[in-house]
Amino acid sequence: YGLVGSEMCIRDRNYYLQECGVKSILLPALEYMRTDKNAEPDPVYIKEKLQMQLELHPGAEIYITQGYICRNAYGEIDNLQRGGSDYTASLIGAAINASEIQIWTDIDGMHNNDPRIVDKTAPVRHLHFEEAAELAYFGAKILHPTCIQPAKYANIPVRLLNTMDPTAPG
């Protein structure tokens, strides 16, 4: 079959960056993202296979990959069941022991209300993992509750940043 969707997108982004002189490398998610027989991410497998991929490209400045796509325990192409790309970012961050996991969205950080609906909301600058997961569980659309778990287990802070205002602190 041919290239589709996210695969075409990441290849295009990679070629663009390389044309701009950036040492970017494409890391296909299907090479390291896998779920177990219960359709849950397999963090041990992810860490091992991702490290192998990273070691193949020591001089890269930027790594480009897909979100949400993976292989299941039977080797078939599948999707993460919940949280999609944000969950992928958290799983990767935990696998590489990142100093911070960044989730880019259309809102600057977690707010006390949804600023897409309520006027004059205020950002909540610091939350514990449990508080962020609870807000997400009870409807904060900016973040899916599953995204917090890998970051929590690895004790890595998660920063929610705004694609419309990239200089905002998040």
Description of each model-found segment:
Residues 28-150, 154-159, 165-170:
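Active-site phosphate/oxyanion-binding loops
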Residues 19-20, 95:
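Active-site catalytic microenvironments for nucleophilic, acid-base chemistry
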Residues 11-19:
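Cysteine-centered nucleophilic/redox motifs
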Residues 6, 20, 31-34:
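Conserved acidic/glycine
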Residues 1-5, 9-12:
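Single conserved hydrophobic/aromatic residue that forms the stacking wall/gate
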